[in-house]
Amino acid sequence: MYIPTISPYAFKIGPIDVHWYGIFMAISIAIGGYYLYRQAMKLNYDEDFLLNLLMIVVISGVVGARLMFVLANYPEWFIKDPVQVLKIYEGGLSWHGAVLGGFLAGLYYCRKKGVRINPLEDFAVLGLSIGNILVRIGNIFNQEVLGRPTEFAFGRWPAQLVGVAMGIILLIRYFYIQKKHMPDGYQFWSFIFYYQLMRGLIEETVRDNPLIWPVYLNEKWGIGFFTLTQLVTPFILILAYWMIRRVLNDPNKQFYN
């Protein structure tokens, strides 16, 4: 949805403009991190280990989000204007890069400390779901992640609200799965599977992103295939499904050692 009168700035601190997007992201990180910490403490994880892990995952997630965004959209910056890559305050983050960066850093740290990551990655799902909700709301303030124009009465697909709905569905699903006591690791990989399925089939179809492989475009309906995210969706689904099967077939195994 596009609201031209809305401001992306919540307030100013001296010369610094504080974006609503940043506030929503910080809130989601705080909620997700606190929840993971509290749940992990119930399983007797070491407190210092958890605090260090959270710091490493958050920093690596932000770095991964920025690098993936630049790689997918402006790869020439790495050579022609590397300083631009560092200007994260100007916007431009990738959800997939954030998850990949945070996961790999968390995996490395857990392996270094000899700690099982499977339960921890499951606890991260709540924060990821809430993050999808709040960050998409932040996208509305930033006037980004817009939907494709359409000839339907609403004029443009509300892609950000589609993302909010996805986050709500995944959050409800998280609590439902928690009650079923599935094996460690199932929550995380099934979350990745269903997130990517909805992202590739629904959100990206109505989102105003470039079609890397323009197989189909209906300007009247405002839908199109295939964006970059849609092209990588089958590979992510295969990986997630493979990990789900491994978790279900051998619940007690730590698959990342």
Curated annotation (Swiss-Prot):
Give a Gene Ontology cellular component term annotated to this protein: plasma membrane
Which compartments is it annotated to reside in?
Cell membrane
What InterPro entries has UniProt attached to this entry? Answer: Lgt (IPR001640)
Residues annotated to bind a 1,2-diacyl-sn-glycero-3-phospho-(1'-sn-glycerol): R136
* Enzyme Commission designation: 2.5.1.145
Pathway given in the UniProt record:
Protein modification; lipoprotein biosynthesis (diacylglyceryl transfer)
| Protein name in the entry | Phosphatidylglycerol--prolipoprotein diacylglyceryl transferase
Specify the species.
Answer: Thermoanaerobacter pseudethanolicus (strain ATCC 33223 / 39E) (Clostridium thermohydrosulfuricum)
**Which gene holds the coding sequence for this protein?**
lgt
